[in-house]
UniProtKB/Swiss-Prot annotation:
Region Disordered: start-end pairs: 1-25, 88-114
InterPro entries: ABA_WDS
Record-given protein name: Abscisic stress-ripening protein 2
Name of the gene: ASR2
The organism of origin for this protein: Solanum lycopersicum (Tomato)
Compositional bias per record (Basic and acidic residues), positions renumbered to this chain: 97-107
Native organism taxonomy: Eukaryota, Viridiplantae, Streptophyta, Embryophyta, Tracheophyta
Biased segments, Basic residues type: 7-16
Family label: Belongs to the abscisic acid and water stress-induced protein family.
Length: 114
């Protein structure tokens, strides 16, 4: 017998659209969800940035372990940039959800004038 292989894709956020399940999409819930994740990203960026500055300060005050603190500073700086990127991504997801909500509820047609 041949073994059946099942491929499972694991994602950090198991984000499913209601449309994929056959139900209507709650756009207000989508907007709130992305807004919440955007705020989490912003907070992560601020926290990681503060920790990077703290490690920079520790590197100056503790010359014996300065190299360790500089490495930790750089790690936190990268984390801050990553969190900022995540917040930026969620901001655009939120904008898209708002746009879809407006199109579905209002039935507005966009006319482009060039």
């Amino acid at each position: 017998m041949a073994e059946e292989k099942h491929q499972h894709h694991h994602h950090l956020f198991h984000h499913k659209n209601k449309e994929d399940e056959g139900g209507p999409v709650d756009y207000e819930k989508e907007v709130k969800h992305h807004s919440h994740l955007e705020k989490i990203g912003e907070l992560g960026a601020v926290a990681a940035g503060a920790l990077a500055l703290h490690e920079k300060h520790k590197a100056k005050k503790d010359p014996e372990h300065a190299h360790k603190h500089k490495i930790e500073e750089e790690i936190m700086a990268v984390a801050a940039v990553g969190a900022g990127g995540f917040a930026f991504h969620e901001h655009h997801q939120k904008k898209d959800a708002k746009k879809e909500k407006k199109e579905v509820e209002g039935g507005h047609h966009h006319h482009h004038h060039y």
